[in-house]
Amino acid sequence: MKITLFFLLFAFTSFGQDSPRVEEKKKAEAIAKQHLQEMQGGFLLVRLDDKKTEIDYYLKYQNDDEAKKVKEKQEKINEQIRLAFTKYFTMCPVYFFYMSDTRNLLDKNYEMMNITDALLQSVSSLDLSSGKFYVAEFGIANQDEVTNDENVNDGVYTERMAVSALVIRTSEMLELRDPFPYFVRYNIMGGVKSRYLGPVKKMQEKLNAFGAY
């Protein structure tokens, strides 16, 4: 009789409490939902490569023709990225800045940054000091991840192979974590006019689906 009561009490206690694994999963989901809400109430900064280091190198050695080629090629790519976000991204307002301003962003020298809209018009009214914004770019997703639910309990993370992707980061350029849909793979060899449209569209769809979850 005592043994039966013991097992009943044990079973009741076990079912009445979530395991550490479940608690960690709930915590991760709550953090991800909070990021989504903050994004909806804030804005997105898209980092564009301006090839400044490469262009400055050619200019240093008076190779103006090569510098011009690099600049024009990158401008065409950036134009397609701006077009993709304008056409498909509706989660929050989107603005753009160049990679050469990354140090200003990280050092919070926001007044030194050149931020523009999709039409390349300078935007000076944004409040970056609040930190209520996220950064996106076509780059590399290489964050560690929990590969299955069992690993959540003991905090074991395995390194994900770095992949070319559209990535969303925090205002401090840190990658978000699952289950937030923070990256979408893309084909760096695809045609310039179609390379960026698909990933941005898919990112918006994933954000919509996560918000409805």
Each language-model region and where it sits:
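Bacterial Sec-dependent N-terminal signal peptides
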Residues: M1-E23
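Short beta-strand and adjacent turn/loop elements
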Residues: D18-Y213
